[in-house]
């Protein structure tokens, strides 16, 4: 909480006393000598010191309290390598997504931030692609992403539309800060109320609705799709058996 970056953000809060800040960051954790190491722990060269790297969201409320959430859904091959002790050297040739590559540390579940009396749930980049991420109780979705690695392709546009899907599924408004992508304000129906151009420096101001509604999808997930697949498999088996018996 006393790092240079955190202190600079707190200095900004002194100018705007009611300001709550949510930003993306690359964070690190040093392991104590006797502490159990994770499978993603990295070793400092020529030192018996281990550390983990995280793709994180940092929240500082208007009282100066600092909370941190570490990304749960990591990008395969870039932020998450299978068999890390064997394949981690491949991280050097992995796609550059604008942050630290290789196997990152992660949390097991989404952590929401308390803003006054409302819960704001951060989604970091690739997490906003997942409809089954398990958001739990929340009033507002906040997406932090770096879309610059897509450059000027359809990728950053598709990523924006995934945010619209999350809004519709959860019936929650979405505020989206996309570094070099399209930042936007999206209502609970998936309508884009405000948006930046691609790769544009912009400041947005908006009143967003805070919803307590829990949709059937948010509670049950993709059960309709799973049931449909199961029924389709049953029909295929029945058809196969019928064809075999008719011969």
Model-derived features with residue positions:
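Enzyme catalytic cores with a strong preference for nitrogen-chemistry domains
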Residues: 1-247
């Amino acid at each position: 909480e006393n790092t240079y970056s955190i202190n600079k953000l707190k200095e900004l809060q002194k100018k705007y006393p009611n300001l709550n800040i949510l930003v993306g960051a690359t964070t690190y954790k040093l392991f104590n000598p006797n502490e159990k190491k994770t499978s993603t722990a990295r070793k400092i060269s020529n030192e018996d010191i281990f550390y983990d790297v995280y793709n994180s969201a940092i929240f500082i409320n208007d009282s100066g309290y600092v909370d941190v959430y570490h990304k749960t859904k990591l990008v395969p091959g870039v932020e998450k390598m299978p068999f890390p002790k064997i394949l981690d050297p491949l991280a050097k040739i992995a796609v550059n997504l604008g942050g630290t590559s290789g196997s990152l540390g992660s949390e097991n579940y989404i952590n929401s931030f308390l803003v006054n009396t409302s819960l704001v749930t951060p989604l970091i980049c690739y997490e906003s692609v997942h409809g089954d991420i398990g958001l739990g109780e929340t009033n507002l979705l906040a997406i932090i992403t770096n879309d610059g690695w897509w450059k000027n392709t359809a990728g950053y546009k598709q990523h924006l539309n995934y945010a619209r899907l999350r809004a519709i599924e959860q019936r929650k408004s979405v505020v989206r800060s996309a570094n070099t992508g399209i930042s936007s304000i999206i209502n609970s129906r998936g309508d884009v109320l405000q948006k930046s151009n691609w790769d544009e420096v912009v400041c947005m101001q908006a009143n967003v609705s805070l919803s307590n509604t829990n949709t059937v999808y948010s509670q049950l997930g993709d059960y309709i799709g799973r049931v449909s697949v199961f029924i389709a498999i049953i029909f295929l088996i029945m058809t196969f058996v019928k064809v075999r018996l008719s011969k």
